[in-house]
A protein has these predicted regions:
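Short, structured beta-strand segments at or near domain termini in extracellular proteins/domains
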Residues: 104-116
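Functional-site microenvironments in short loops/helix caps that host divalent-cation chemistry
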Residues: 1-96
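Short coil/turn motifs at beta-sheet boundaries
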Residues: 35, 102-104
Length: 116
């Protein structure tokens, strides 16, 4: 459910208790994933390269799906931001979508590459 395990711990992530502002990367080391990824819960949700398609997961591979080649003109946004309304929406697996031109304070991005 969460990068650190299945039990919710408010002290492991930025959920806006310090004035609803993003914080320096790595400020919540207890919340790091087992892979060493920082800040996967709280702070801001993140844009993904994947296009959104409402039926994609009906026929996708179970392991490491790459996302549809084309979609509805919307991109995927993942992860719960500090503005989430409940703990369920703070999970890394939360999947939303938006227009690529959308901008707001609850969505950012993360630079990443394949480990191979």
């Amino acid at each position: 459910r969460f990068p650190w395990g299945n039990v919710w711990e408010i002290k492991f992530c930025n959920v806006g208790t310090d004035g609803n502002l993003p914080v320096t990367v790595g400020s919540f080391e207890e919340g790091n994933s087992v892979y060493g990824c920082y800040d996967m819960t709280g702070s801001v949700s993140e844009w993904c390269e994947d296009w959104y398609h409402p039926e994609y997961y009906l026929s996708t591979p179970k392991k490491n799906p790459k996302g549809p080649i084309k979609g509805t003109g919307k991109r995927i946004i993942r992860g719960g931001s500090m503005f989430a309304q409940n703990v369920y929406k703070l999970r890394c697996a939360v999947r939303m979508f938006g227009e690529p031109s959308d901008r707001n304070k609850s969505v950012g991005f993360r630079c990443a590459k394949d480990a191979e």
